[in-house]
Every structure is written in structure tokens, then in C-alpha cells.
């Protein structure tokens, strides 16, 4: 285990440099994520739902190929990660990026919300930003810290559960408002630098809010990424900073 506070990213126009408590190494969590991702792929392949929509897979791969090189703005090591991009055919409205760059999109998110390439890029940039900031590692560290306090008080009867952290945990992780704000900001910048219109962040979240209306159970993506008006307002406030990056990318600069 590692102890202490650090920041996982730096630089960028709207990046984040908040200090984070980390009590588990990146290598440990990345290995866990890689194993979980491999199991998810195997389970999905066995069900015949992995990468069956070749057109959508090609589309998602093309967008990822433009965004991944931009991650070096925030982390010099990130472009060299062992990136993976796959698509599960499912009506589920979800997408995520596990630690270390393991990306998964569900076809329902794109099909049911009729996402444009710009909107897909916003989703992808947001999810990648969670991985860049190592929000999952931070959450595990907070759980470890809480257990250590309970141990000192003699109140905890359970194990830490870190070893049992499976892909269901990575998929269903509910990040804090601070985490979500950081991912929104950095995701906008990543997509803009890759030549995708950051204004799509506004249309995307309006679509998300519409999808959540009249539903007794919110879509999977919204259960972990709540769509709120103030979230849209924050994105709108960032557009003057990231639009020049998009315009420069479109000019090929």
C-alpha cells in the first residue's frame, strides 16, 4: 500500500490539480481493472453480444483514436497506456472507462439517444477523465482509510473487500460531485483538442435529462452520472475556454 496525498493530473486549460488521498498503488488497481475487463469481455463474448455491431465499433474506435493522444495534456504517461475499446450490444444506456484505459460502450446509449460523434466524444472524454484522475483508486483508498479508522476503534468485523473488487464495482461506481465536475471539465477539453465540438456537452446532457423523465428507474448511465441543470450551466461556462482549442484542432493546428 501507498500512503499520502497527491494529484494525478496537471496542466490543461480547465484541468484539475486537487490533492487526492491514495492508499493503493496505480499498478494494483490497474491490474484489478484489467482482470475485471477481461472477464467482462469473456462473459459478453459468451453471450454473443461483444462487438457484434461492426459499424458502431468502427465509429467508437475512430473517436477513441483521436481522443487518446490528447490525454498527454493531463498525464504524460496516459498516451502509453494499454488502451482497449469494445462495444456491448445491449439496450443499456451506459459507457465507462476502467483504470488504465479500458473503455466499454453499450450500443443502447448511442442508439436510443441518437448520439452524434461529437456527443459520443463528450461521453468518452468524460469517462477517460475519471481514469486519468484515478477516481476509482481514490474511492478504494477512502474505503481503506475508513476501515482503518474502524479497526482502530475495534468496530469493523469485515475485510477490506479490495481483493473482491470486480467489474460490477467498476461499472456501477458512483462518483462524487467533485469527481463528476472534474471529469466534465477535463472531458470537454479532451474532446475539443481532438476536434470534437465541446458544445455537444450541452446537447448531450439535455438528452440525458430527457431520458430520465417519466422513468421509474433512471438509465444506468444516469444512476452514476446524474444529469442536472447546474451541470449544464457549468459546461456552458467552460465553453469560452475550450472553444479556441476546438477551432484550432479543426484548422489542423
What are these regions (language model features)?
Residues 3-253:
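A Zn2+-metalloprotease active-site environment signal
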